[in-house]
């Protein structure tokens, strides 16, 4: 072929399952452990987003065996002009080997680019104004803690040029 058209949009994998309420056999991030973990004390560096935000959560090994836990941060953007999945993985971190009863605080960082989506009509990466929900868990469907922060006004994260714009129309799924 002389050309190949990529026709896969933003609703791929867990983004599709979570947004359209489809239960997969194993959700994104699913894993087994020989122990159990408890999440507590979610803290944001502020209630209003500036140029970045840190999110911390304490993870405690509540089982009888030592183990490690992967902490996943999902972000839900305001449902406004930009079509987005219900949540997207934006950061993750792994604990050290936690002994039974031991805790560790994991700190993750969100930057403006983590909030942005590309808006072709504006040739820019934009973070919409509004309330954003941070969800922390061990998989895309097993959320343990959540918190909300606000973006007071639209942020233009990066402006681009429209070079080699395609003349092929693409219809993506919509919520």
Model-predicted regions and their roles:
Residues 63-64, 80, 123:
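Detector for glycine-centered tight turns/loop "hinges" at secondary-structure junctions
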Residues 1-68, 74-76, 100, 128-129, ...:
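Secreted, periplasmic, or luminal enzymes acting at the cell surface/secretory milieu
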Residues 109-139:
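Short, surface-exposed ligand- or partner-binding patches at beta-edge/loop junctions that are enriched
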Residues 81-120:
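Intrinsically disordered, low-complexity Pro/Gly/Ser/Thr-rich segments with frequent PxxP/GP/PP motifs
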Residues 66-73, 85, 118-121:
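Short, hydrophobic/aromatic beta-strand segments
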